[in-house]
């Protein structure tokens, strides 16, 4: 029997700040950041299959199915499900509605993978806990556990050590500068600051507005001038900064009307949109404790 779960949100995130505090022996960078969920993202649709096949039914230019984090997440969970119940087949058709830009620093691919793990854990009745799903997610990428964690979080380590943090209700204007940033290019730069002094959660909670910076931003601005142009333009309205390794930039506003007013003035060569801060992942209800 085919079971379906349609219109599953895969929300984007913004890095309210992002500090690089060191580097591990294996080359991974040590980070501190606050991840903020927003109400804009991709949308996924799932239907179970009885033949053990995992199929992405959507054509995504430049993203082969076999390397797509969505397919990799499904196959990873399929392996665990099969080990738990060898007599049963675990297959799925997955459709992906991409609304977020690739290489934008919004966590789109990671969020898609997390939504896949949450949805198929439910449909396949795999019974994995949130912690177990987060551990699987870490095998796919450092940002995936956050989206399974499902709450705004202070992140450390390579981004996988998460503590829930309160953030204010507000709106964001986000600009897509029209470039796609390869994350490895930013982290491999000799100009990247890798020794920012670590901060505490209380430092962020006590300041919130305009706290910290994005250490990756200086490198990205030099490599991709449209990012610098977007930050300079948006900065006339508030504390504009880049999210993740770019390319998207954002600025917070207390009122929706303020965000709407700024949107009407964005130069036409940029794509821009508004988003609302949210406190929990929309699929949090699917999680096992």
From Swiss-Prot:
ATP binds at residues 101-111. GO terms for biological process: isopentenyl diphosphate biosynthetic process, methylerythritol 4-phosphate pathway; terpenoid biosynthetic process. Pathway: Isoprenoid biosynthesis; isopentenyl diphosphate biosynthesis via DXP pathway; isopentenyl diphosphate from 1-deoxy-D-xylulose 5-phosphate: step 3/6. GO terms for molecular function: 4-(cytidine 5'-diphospho)-2-C-methyl-D-erythritol kinase activity; ATP binding. This is 4-diphosphocytidyl-2-C-methyl-D-erythritol kinase. The active site is at residues 13, 143. The keyword ATP-binding applies. Catalyzes the phosphorylation of the position 2 hydroxy group of 4-diphosphocytidyl-2C-methyl-D-erythritol. It catalyses: 4-CDP-2-C-methyl-D-erythritol + ATP = 4-CDP-2-C-methyl-D-erythritol 2-phosphate + ADP + H(+). It comes from Janthinobacterium sp. (strain Marseille) (Minibacterium massiliensis). Belongs to the GHMP kinase family. IspE subfamily. Its EC number is 2.7.1.148. InterPro entries: GHMP_kinase_C_dom, GHMP_kinase_C_sf, GHMP_kinase_N_dom, IspE, Ribosomal_Su5_D2-typ_SF, Ribsml_uS5_D2-typ_fold_subgr. SUPFAM superfamilies: GHMP Kinase, C-terminal domain, Ribosomal protein S5 domain 2-like. Pfam families: GHMP_kinases_C (PF08544), GHMP_kinases_N (PF00288). The keyword Kinase applies. Keywords: ATP-binding, Isoprene biosynthesis, Kinase, Nucleotide-binding, Transferase.
